[in-house]
């Protein structure tokens, strides 16, 4: 008998159906010589500090360096603290029963670091030593499962992948647990946390926010002239900006209705914009955020759902290339995409005979290839699934389309002994850009705001028919959006536009394609950042933490990127795990010392007018907001269910009696809902739910 373990029930049931294990049991499927069971995500994880005898945070216990680390059944946070997840415990017993009945195991968890870790932690926790093989596939279609089952890999071949995942988990534990406890001791605020990856990411957001907020805009002036001939005109700009209005006006005064300009240079150049590579997860997340305002977490969850429905390949990929042996499948997919309603017009002229092959490179495909659609026809996609599927399908058309051909035109002229310049770009052949034909893409082609279409010849003398000045001002770097933050995480904050250079930097990025969405989500959950429109900005709490640790190693973006590279070296057999763990333990000790040595200023205690008594001041403290009038008694606990009210929420509640809608409350049964926090008639805190929209009567 052979056991197969998948990562989720739906995947396990699909595999069972394909291999003929059709008899349904409690927590597994049986038949045809197989027992197919499944995990429910991470059933086993690293134990919390209490398992090693550590109580509340104390200076004497830090740094905590467990040796060895202990594994425990997944735990969940409740009002009584951390308790064992009953559903995880139950499924582990099923897995234990299945493994005990079988001679060998086939590992069918997701083909990546986390999928490998999920199985290995279960395997080690249950104490098994039975041999296992690896089902390593990039899609869940029936054909892919059959092909994978006939080409199983030795489990030992993925030991280094497991070691990298295990080291990453232990590194996160060491830095996160120790730095957070040190922060609690140094600041006197126990509910804040630091992390190996979350803190450098917070530092990037805070640094950009402060740079943007504190930017002092400087005015400057531009001088422009209009040249016209035979009813056609072109606007030229002075080659230098003026720092003062007086200087600009003095220069402007040199012109008269009789002024002419001599064309001194006309340069035409053909330029080409290569088709983009196929999507990896991060570029998909960036584009879904830019064009459809979807968060990185939402994009990943939708892509995962499409993968489990067999509509797309494995989503957590870091590759933007495919191998030559996939081209037959891709060719068939391109025919299908070309008939989709969204691409039908472009599909009529798509050149199937001369495909752009820059996304096809066997040497650049590692564990998984780029994101592509499968041959399975989608059925009943919801709105977000339709968006993500269309984005992936459209990117395939773009990637295999011709490059975009442009003509750039630069003209220079001399007028009144001054030099002027006009730049413009015209698309000659849109190539891949015609797939989506986005308006915002077309606007990027206008390199300067010069108007007109006239084209002059070198040596011509052209009348100056208009001239004027315009005031401009310098602008700061924009705040991060999720799309631009993801790009910055890939390059550790470096501004890199060249695609080849970006690919080379991937080894030094913060996080991985599979983890970046979770990092951003963690910052939201910690109340360290919030959204302002599409921008990500720090909360008061987030800025407070950043100011305290910004110069420390725990917030060092490039150092965090170097850790990612060492994890990749472990995965590639070029670095020993002991070497990495020794470095992380030393780093943890250093970070702990640094944080414990912090001198935190007492947080400013804000106060707001009391809406209940009208005379007292409501003092805002870390855990409560309380009126200072002893006869009033207004008291607001800042923790409501799983949410903590930030100062903005308290301002809304105390000034208008209700907060704005707060998303992501969790009830006692774990159900998620949205609500506002409000006062009732007696100033008790309650939840207010949005009214459901009623349809129009017919």
Give a label for each model feature:
Residues 87, 100, 142-225, 268-269:
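C-terminal or mid-to-C-terminal helical accessory/interaction module adjacent to the motor/catalytic core
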Residues 1-169, 173-175, 476:
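Intrinsically disordered, low-complexity regulatory segments
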Residues 243-279, 285:
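Metal- or metallocofactor-binding catalytic centers and their adjacent structured scaffolds
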Residues 23-27, 130-132, 155-160, 181-185, ...:
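Active-site phosphate-binding and catalytic loops of NTP-dependent enzymes
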Residues 9-16, 33-36, 40, 59-62, ...:
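Amphipathic alpha-helical transducer elements in NTP-driven molecular machines
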Residues 1-3, 110-111, 188-191, 268-277, ...:
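Conserved short loop/turn motifs at secondary-structure junctions
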Residues 2, 81, 125, 214, ...:
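Basic, low-complexity terminal or inter-domain segments flanking catalytic cores
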């Amino acid at each position: 008998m052979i056991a197969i373990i998948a990562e989720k029930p739906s995947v396990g049931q699909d595999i069972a159906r394909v291999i003929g294990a059709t008899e349904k049991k409690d927590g597994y499927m049986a038949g045809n010589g197989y027992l197919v069971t499944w995990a429910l995500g991470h059933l086993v994880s690293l134990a919390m500090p209490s398992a090693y005898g550590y109580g509340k945070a104390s200076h004497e216990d830090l740094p905590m360096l467990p040796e060895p680390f202990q594994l425990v059944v997944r735990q969940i946070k409740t009002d009584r603290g951390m308790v064992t997840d009953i559903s995880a415990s139950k499924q582990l017993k099923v897995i234990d029963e299945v493994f005990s009945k079988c001679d060998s195991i086939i590992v069918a968890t997701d083909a990546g670091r986390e999928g490998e870790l999920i199985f290995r932690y279960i395997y080690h926790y249950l104490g098994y030593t039975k041999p296992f093989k690896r089902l390593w596939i990039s899609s869940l279609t029936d054909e892919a499962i059959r092909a994978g089952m006939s080409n199983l890999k030795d489990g030992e071949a993925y030991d280094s992948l497991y070691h990298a995942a295990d080291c990453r988990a232990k590194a996160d534990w060491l830095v996160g647990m120790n730095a957070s406890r040190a922060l609690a001791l140094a600041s006197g605020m126990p509910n804040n946390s630091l992390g190996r990856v979350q803190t450098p990411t917070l530092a990037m957001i805070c640094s950009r926010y402060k740079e943007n907020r504190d930017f002092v805009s400087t005015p400057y002036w531009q001088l422009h002239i209009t040249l016209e001939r035979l009813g056609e005109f072109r606007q030229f700009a002075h080659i230098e900006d003026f720092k003062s209005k007086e200087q600009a006006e003095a220069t402007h005064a040199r012109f008269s209705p009789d002024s002419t300009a001599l064309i001194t240079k006309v340069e035409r150049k053909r330029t080409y914009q290569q088709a983009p590579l196929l999507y990896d997860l991060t570029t998909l997340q960036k584009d879904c955020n830019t064009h459809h305002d979807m968060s990185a977490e939402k994009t990943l969850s939708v892509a995962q759902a499409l993968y489990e429905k067999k509509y797309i390949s494995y989503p957590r990929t870091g590759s933007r290339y495919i191998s030559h042996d996939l081209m037959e499948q891709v060719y068939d997919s391109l025919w299908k995409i070309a008939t989709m309603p969204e691409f039908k017009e472009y599909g009529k002229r798509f050149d199937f005979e001369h495909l752009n092959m820059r996304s096809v490179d066997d040497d650049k495909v590692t564990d998984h290839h780029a994101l592509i659609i499968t041959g399975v026809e989608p059925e009943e996609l919801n709105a977000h699934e339709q968006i993500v599927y269309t984005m992936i399908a459209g990117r395939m058309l773009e990637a295999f389309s011709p490059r975009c051909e442009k003509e750039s035109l630069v003209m220079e002229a001399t007028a009144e002994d001054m030099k002027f310049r006009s730049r413009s770009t015209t698309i000659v052949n849109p190539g891949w850009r015609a797939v989506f034909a986005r308006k915002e893409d077309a606007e990027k082609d206008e390199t300067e705001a010069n108007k007109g279409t006239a084209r002059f010849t070198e040596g011509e003398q052209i009348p100056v028919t208009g001239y004027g000045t315009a005031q401009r001002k310098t602008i700061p770097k924009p705040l991060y959006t999720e799309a631009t933050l993801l790009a910055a995480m890939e390059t550790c904050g470096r501004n890199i536009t060249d695609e080849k250079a970006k690919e080379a930097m991937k080894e030094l990025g913060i996080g991985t394609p599979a983890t970046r969405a979770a990092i951003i989500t963690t910052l939201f959950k910690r109340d360290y950042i919030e959204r302002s429109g599409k921008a990500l900005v720090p909360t008061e709490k987030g800025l407070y933490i950043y100011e305290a640790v910004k110069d420390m190693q725990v917030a060092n973006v490039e150092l965090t990127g170097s850790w990612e590279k060492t994890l990749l070296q472990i995965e590639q057999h070029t670095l020993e795990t002991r070497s990495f763990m020794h470095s992380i333990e030393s780093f943890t000790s250093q970070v702990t010392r640094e944080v414990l040595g912090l001198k935190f200023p007492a947080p400013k205690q804000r106060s707001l007018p009391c809406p209940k008594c009208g005379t007292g001041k409501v003092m805002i403290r870390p855990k409560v907001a309380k009126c200072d009038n002893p006869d009033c008694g207004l008291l607001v606990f800042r923790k409501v269910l799983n949410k903590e009210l930030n100062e903005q929420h308290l301002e809304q509640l105390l000034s208008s009696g209700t907060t704005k809608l707060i998303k992501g409350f969790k009830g006692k049964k774990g159900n998620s809902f949205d609500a506002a926090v409000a006062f009732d008639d007696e100033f008790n805190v309650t939840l207010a739910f949005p009214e459901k929209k009623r349809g129009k009567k017919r």
